[in-house]
A protein has these predicted regions:
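Conserved PLP cofactor-binding pocket of PLP-dependent enzymes
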Residues: 1-5, 47-51, 87-120, 127-133
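A secondary-structure boundary/capping signal
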Residues: 27-30, 102, 137
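Active-site region of PLP-dependent enzymes
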Residues: 1-72, 107-110
């Protein structure tokens, strides 16, 4: 089977909500840094907005009354662009930019296909999955690296 390395499939329905003691201790220690991490990620997100403004992409909408943690920074390629998100992904990865494709529509996973779900039943989720790319975002992302990401996207999309 020809599987792309970013893809994943749900073969079975299952849950695992257990957290180890070590994970709990690590999580508790990280809470002290949470505000700093969120502020830094918000600065990086704002810089992405500024650097990518005017490009044929859509940004994730953020409620003005909320503060996003920007766990991810997702852009969506507009339909007017003559490049697929997979091609953009591949070209950015060739430049050593660690972008990701996320959120494969769950109704297209084998488990749900066996239940009768098929392509075309949830068009918006399919369109989202076919256009969304997660850009690098982490507290220590340098301005230089972020500018390189933005410059690369501009070069590829134009």
């Amino acid at each position: 089977k020809d599987t792309k390395y970013w893809s994943y499939e749900q073969q079975e329905l299952g849950f695992n909500y257990r957290m180890t003691d070590l994970q709990a201790a690590l999580g508790r220690s990280q809470l002290q840094k949470l505000d700093k991490f969120i502020n830094k990620r918000n600065l990086i997100a704002k810089r992405y907005y500024d650097l990518l403004h005017g490009m044929p992409i859509k940004f994730q909408k953020i409620n003005k009354k909320a503060i996003s943690s920007f766990h991810l920074f997702i852009i969506r390629i507009e339909k007017s662009v003559n490049i697929s998100h997979e091609d953009l992904f591949t070209k950015l990865r060739k430049r050593n930019i660690m972008v990701n494709l996320l959120y494969s529509p769950i109704h297209l996973h084998p488990y749900y296909r066996r239940l009768g779900y098929k392509k075309g039943m949830f068009i918006e989720s399919e369109e989202y999955a076919d256009s969304a790319i997660s850009l690098p975002i982490f507290p220590k992302l340098s301005i230089k690296d972020q500018k390189f990401v933005a410059k690369s996207i501009k070069e590829i999309l134009h």
